[in-house]
């Protein structure tokens, strides 16, 4: 298709593009036509600056759309904006940018309207019409963002389908205003809305305060229908949308109505009825879809995404996120929505507690995933729940909690529906309506969880001897459950089993459905042979502890053994081996820790801090550290984030190269200090590969490497099979048999990785 690009001089350029072209590809085409380097181009559409890694279709840019080209004059710089939640945002700016421009950039990143932003620098509030240079704001300065809330409040509107909408309102809003807000969110015309509160229908001319509707009140929305018929559309998240349609409506019309209600572009929608995908040009009556039929909506996705957060009260919050958001960012968004401080939030996914510094994509959290939010309560008590697989779950409870509440908490942690749970204590099955104190269950008591199963599917497990075992399972079974079933059949203890599917080792806490294991899939069973061994753990005080372990023990198990010996809670322990911080879910053998190896134990003192690391490419990385962290620890964190081996890193602060064995506090490195990272290269060269999620991978290559070799290196790092990879450079797709030097790809060039998804759909 053709699009137009209009420059500030009034000149209009015509480009030939595809909807799947990235903004970067478009900039390369502009460079071909006009000679303007991509890093000096800023493209604007519908008032929004376009990001390199996103595609034209992500921004709904269609044929004959006009983009605006603004030039970034040399002397761009980065500044930081710190919010009250402690989150730090990085912005690309020019000294000549106005405060208004900066607020618009913050809106693009964080979604906060400019009129709710107050920016503070050097204790002074900044005025919209002034520039950064007026205030002497230079590169790497930190501004502080304070929100101006205006006496508004939130209310909820519940529809007959069970969907709950959240609205921002004022007590002085009329019912008419509220209906207009519902129309903005849901596309329902006001004249089809009836609002009910406390059993009373609300009149248009009256205000919320007339009806004593206060913050977090729930109104009920009933539709007044006329003609036509209703059908339901069910999404993968279980949400049901109600549509008003005619039998003669085409599938295309239906997708347009879904777009009006939910904002999902038609080209991202696939509709299924009676197991069949519906074609755009056909009508509802062609498919015999009648009133109150239910269609299923499956999304073809790319770019930003929605996730859900479910609280223990059953409330579900919807968040707009990117796969590259950290858990810390997510907690800040929850604080913005719900007012819960991040340090009281624990987020659980697939039965695992999520760590602040990791990203959503690290945990394979995808669009429309549901996280569970558990509050760390002051008071209360802890109890343990032991499953038949030997796994122990820790719950925060009150003595007055009912058994039903406890089962709900187990569901939040493990995803097991309450009606499949039986809880046993002191040999007795516990009844739903009774409380923990009725059964004299006290702090640190252990309950036993037995599952009642139903339904399910068969899978096969193939051993190295060629024997195939058949198992009855549920998609919601954890890998741990599967190992317990193998133990029942074959007598092999779970801790000696490693299960492999699609070339990947399966982790105990994840479920079969997490790995997309379906009926009649075949898993491969590899045995971990016994051999207990001793390792040593050395503390900063010089004390050495001896532990009895197995190579298959996880780092979590090791921390539990240290807690048994020394009383140090696992969440205050950081274990270091060979200069690398060890992750809870990995095993000793994953890190090649052998008998009589020595680990180093560093305590996480409350009161970590953030520092910044700036690379030669201008990229800034944010790290969570302690003043007591060694330079070695910091390099390990950089390796975790960027994949750069510690022995290739040189860190510079205040003009001095930092030595591995010294700590941050030795060098007086304080919160928000910026270190500089210089790479020591040996032979070869480095290139960068940028994914659509914005993640950048660093690869060591030779100019003579083929594109095929490069794809193999990406597979080693990211696990993406070569036949699903398309590599783009300077707007051109690279062919497997050609070399990097054929394409003039030099050191520190950036390639773009686009995935080819099974079934010919491109993401």
Swiss-Prot record:
Gene3D superfamilies: Phosphatidylinositol 3-kinase Catalytic Subunit, Chain A, domain 1
Site (Essential for function): residue numbering on this chain: 68
GO cellular component: cytoplasm; cytosol; nucleoplasm; nucleus
Residues at the site labelled Interacts with activating enzyme: 54, 72
Propeptide: 761-763
GO biological process: larval midgut cell programmed cell death; macroautophagy; modification-dependent protein catabolic process; protein ubiquitination
Superkingdom as given in the UniProt entry: Eukaryota
Keyword match Ubl conjugation: yes
Task performed by this protein: Ubiquitin exists either covalently attached to another protein, or free (unanchored). When covalently bound, it is conjugated to target proteins via an isopeptide bond either as a monomer (monoubiquitin), a polymer linked via different Lys residues of the ubiquitin (polyubiquitin chains) or a linear polymer linked via the initiator Met of the ubiquitin (linear polyubiquitin chains). Polyubiquitin chains, when attached to a target protein, have different functions depending on the Lys residue of the ubiquitin that is linked: Lys-48-linked is involved in protein degradation via the proteasome.
Entry protein name: Polyubiquitin
Species: Drosophila melanogaster
GN (gene name): Ubi-p63E
């Amino acid at each position: 298709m053709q699009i137009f690009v209009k420059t500030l001089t009034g000149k209009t350029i015509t480009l030939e593009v595809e909807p799947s072209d990235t903004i970067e590809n478009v900039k390369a085409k502009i460079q071909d036509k006009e000679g303007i380097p991509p890093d000096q181009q800023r493209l604007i559409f519908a008032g929004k600056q376009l990001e390199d890694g996103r595609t034209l279709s992500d921004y709904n840019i269609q044929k004959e759309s006009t983009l605006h080209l603004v030039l970034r004059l040399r002397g761009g710089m980065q500044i930081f904006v710190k919010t009250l939640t402690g989150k730090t945002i990085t912005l690309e700016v020019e000294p000549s940018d106005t405060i208004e421009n900066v607020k618009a950039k913050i809106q693009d990143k964080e979604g906060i309207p400019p009129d709710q932003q107050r920016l503070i620098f050097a204790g002074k509030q900044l005025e919209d019409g002034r520039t950064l240079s007026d205030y002497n704001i230079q590169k790497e300065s930190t501004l502080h963002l304070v929100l101006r809330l205006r006496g508004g409040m939130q209310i909820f509107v519940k529809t007959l389908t069970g969907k709950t909408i959240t609205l921002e309102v004022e007590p002085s809003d009329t019912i008419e205003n509220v209906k207009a807000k519902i129309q903005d969110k849901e596309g329902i015309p006001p004249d089809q809305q009836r609002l009910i509160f406390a059993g009373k229908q609300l009149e248009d001319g009256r205000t919320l305060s007339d009806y004593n509707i206060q913050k977090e009140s729930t109104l009920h929305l009933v539709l007044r229908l006329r003609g036509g018929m209703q059908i339901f559309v069910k999404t993968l998240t279980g949400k049901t949308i109600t549509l008003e349609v005619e039998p003669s409506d085409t599938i295309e019309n239906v997708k347009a109505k879904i777009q009006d209600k939910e904002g999902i572009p038609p080209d991202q929608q696939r509709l299924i009825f009676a197991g069949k995908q519906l074609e755009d040009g056909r009508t509802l009556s062609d498919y015999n879809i009648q009133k109150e039929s239910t269609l299923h909506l499956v999304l073809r996705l790319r770019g930003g995404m929605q996730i859900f957060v479910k609280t223990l009260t059953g409330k579900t919050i919807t968040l707009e996120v990117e796969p590259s958001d950290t858990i810390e960012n997510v907690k800040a968004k929850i604080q913005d929505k719900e007012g819960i401080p991040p340090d009281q939030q624990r987020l659980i996914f697939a039965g695992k507690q999520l760590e602040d510094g990791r990203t959503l994509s690290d945990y394979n959290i995808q669009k429309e995933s549901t996280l569970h939010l558990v509050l760390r309560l002051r008071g209360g008590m802890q109890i343990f729940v032991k499953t038949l697989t030997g796994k122990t779950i820790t719950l925060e409870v009150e003595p007055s909690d009912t058994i039903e509440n406890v089962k709900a908490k187990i569901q939040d942690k493990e995803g097991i529906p309450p009606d499949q749970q039986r809880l046993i204590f002191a040999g007795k099955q516990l009844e739903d309506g009774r409380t923990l104190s009725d059964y004299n269950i006290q702090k640190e008591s252990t309950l036993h969880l037995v599952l009642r199963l139903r339904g399910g599917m068969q899978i096969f497990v193939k051993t190295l001897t060629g024997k195939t075992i058949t198992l009855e399972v549920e998609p919601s079974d954890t890998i741990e459950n599967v190992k317990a079933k193998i133990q029942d059949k074959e007598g092999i203890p779970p801790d000696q089993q490693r299960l492999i599917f699609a070339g990947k080792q399966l982790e105990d806490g994840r479920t079969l459905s997490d790995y997309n294991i379906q009926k009649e899939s075949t898993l491969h069973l590899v045995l971990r042979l016994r051999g207990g061994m001793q390792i040593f753990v050395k503390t900063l005080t010089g004390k050495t502890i001896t532990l009895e372990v197995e190579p298959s023990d996880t780092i979590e198990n090791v921390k539990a053994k240290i807690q048994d010996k020394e009383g140090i809670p696992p969440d205050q322990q950081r274990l270091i081996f060979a200069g690398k911080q060890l992750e809870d879910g990995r095993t000793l053998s994953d890190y090649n820790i052998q008998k009589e190896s020595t680990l180093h134990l560093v305590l996480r003192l409350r009161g970590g801090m953030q520092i910044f690391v700036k690379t030669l490419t201008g990229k800034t990385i944010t790290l969570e550290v302690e003043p007591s962290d060694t330079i070695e620890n910091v390099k390990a964190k950089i390796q975790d984030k960027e994949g750069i081996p510690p022995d290739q890193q040189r860190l510079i602060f205040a003009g001095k190269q930092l030595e591995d064995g010294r700590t941050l506090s030795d060098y007086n490195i304080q919160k928000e200090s910026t270190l500089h990272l210089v790479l020591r290269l040996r032979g070869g060269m480095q290139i960068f590969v940028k994914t659509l999620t914005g993640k950048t991978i660093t690869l060591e290559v030779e100019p003579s490497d083929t594109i095929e070799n490069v794809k193999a290196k990406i597979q080693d790092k990211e696990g993406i099979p070569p036949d699903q990879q398309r590599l783009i450079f300077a707007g051109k797709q690279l062919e497997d048999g050609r070399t990097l030097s054929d394409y003039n790809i030099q050191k520190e060039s950036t390639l773009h990785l686009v995935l080819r998804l099974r079934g010919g759909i491109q993401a």
